[in-house]
Amino acid sequence: MSETATTNKETRGFQSEVKQLLHLMIHSLYSNKEIFLRELISNASDAVDKLRFQALSHPDLYQGDAELGVKLSFDKDKNTLTISDNGIGMTRDEVIENLGTIAKSGTAEFFSKLSQEQSKNSQLIGQFGVGFYSAFIVADAVTVRTRAAGSAPADAVQWYSKGEGEYTVETINKESRGTDIILHLREEGKEFLSEWRLRDVISKYSDHIGIPVYIQTSVMDEEGKATEETKWEQINKAQALWTRAKSEVTDEEYKEFYKHVSHDFADPLVWSHNKVEGKNDYTSLLYIPAKAPWDLFNREHKHGLKLYVQRVFIMDDAAQFMPSYLRFVRGLIDSNDLPLNVSREILQDNKITQSLRQACTKRVLTMLERMASNDADNYQKFWKEFGLVMKEGPAEDFANREKIASLLRFASTHIDSAEQTISLASYVERMKEGQDKIYYLTADSYTAAKNSPHLEQFKSKGIEVILMFDRIDEWLMNYLPEFEGKAFQSITKAGLDLSQFEDEAEKEKHKETEEQFKSVVERLKGYLGSRVKEVRTTFKLANTPAVVVTDDYEMGTQMAKLLAAAGQPVPEVKYILEVNPEHALVKRMADEADEQTFGRWAEVLLGQAMLAERGSMEDPSQFLGAVNQLLAPSH
């Protein structure tokens, strides 16, 4: 290749406040300096795509050079890195317009000229113009030599700038079609004068561009030593895995690709690969990992999908495409028509983004539904790793609340195990005749839940109760009022009514007992006063003298504990004391004529009930004093 300056050299100022913009971009716009290579290879890919598209109707543009690609070479002596392509190239006017203006791209102009159908087929990126200027992150000067397809060698153009507000442009001779970008590297950019560093960056950012990317490497002799002779070696695969038909990709390839995008050593549990054409054209490849990352609940945890636009890598951790409760999902989305902000690091919050988010969310939920139905063992592995995160779903995603609810798993009295294997659908299938509610209990632990006195009548009547003991559970139930038309009912709430499971004789007996016990209830109210909201009789207990419950719309015990643990203000919870009139201890108290001794029994009843419900009491000394006096009364 030979380039010689000829005529018509001029110095021009940039058409905007480029000096300030370059300074801002270099120090703020891009998060890491190696992105410059992604931008320049992306631009080269655009140029090749433009030529390929134009050559469909004008094949003579190839001029005998139809092997399209991008080539990278470096010169340690000159301290330069060169990115070359044999794409569409630029004329002098195009150079001035496209390289002399910030936020202007030849791609956007080219794209606007296409008909709707053509634009579907032309894979173009770069709807803005700052990508080229990212070269100044690592270079203190940039030379561009370019020759437009179909033009003569003598009509080539050279552009040169130090990024300080002005540039020079002149006409040169250039034998080959396309563009060479020569970066004169600053000190902190010299790390890119390395074949292995370039290989690493190309593999990271450009492995799945549909055109080959080559680097110039030394030819080795028989002893494995580098000679002065060089050759071009293709570095990228030049075919994106997700663009291939699903039938052409093996399970092993899917697993290896997962490890590539996630940096995980384990195989994924399951994946979903889909290409969608229509209002939005995109491909998604979504994976469910086998293990949760250690920082899944860390607020700083980065999550989201890899974003590609027309097979060019744009960013990691694009959280806009997945709700927070699905933050464990790995994979990518490749959009053909997604608009981006000028930095490509920040997605525009627009209708396309929202549409893709909804589609990806439904895809993941469907994938999980299939796993739950067809592979219960794997779904149980998934639940152990990500169940707590899934429980955030009903609060965050109202539109998919029923789907999320069907994926939740709990322990229950149906199985004597702390394993959360019970689905809400299976619970509903086992509901007793006449049962119209889904009964549940929240507690600090599985042991506390399964031994709760609130369960006594449910056990005697054979009614299944869901046992919840994760810290998030009571918060979750605020956002999950029903499932399949069946309302949820906490069995620790005052509104609990099991009368539909009693026969008439039982109801009549309870009514008589309640009437007889009224005076005892009044005595208890008089002694306990404002320490409880109310005192009432209950027939849901068998082996326990009393329990405390809260009103249906009052904060529950577990929610109060959750707020307290988070350092949040906790409103005072006023409990209702429910007393079992058929328990021997309560009968003994009812027969007690001495008010002081009666008061001690009242202390014991309330203290036991509070201890069972909360695991603590406000004044243990008062409770212990009453117990001691009852055990060893003074003579």
Curated annotation (Swiss-Prot):
Residues 345-561 are annotated as: B. Residues 1-344 are annotated as: A. InterPro entries: HATPase_C_sf, Heat_shock_protein_90_CS, HSP90_C, Hsp90_fam, Hsp90_N, Ribosomal_Su5_D2-typ_SF. Pfam families: HATPase_c_3 (PF13589), HSP90 (PF00183). Its main location: cytoplasm. Keywords: ATP-binding, Chaperone, Cytoplasm, Nucleotide-binding, Stress response. One of its GO terms (cellular component) is cytosol. Homodimer. Belongs to the heat shock protein 90 family. This is Chaperone protein HtpG. The gene is htpG.
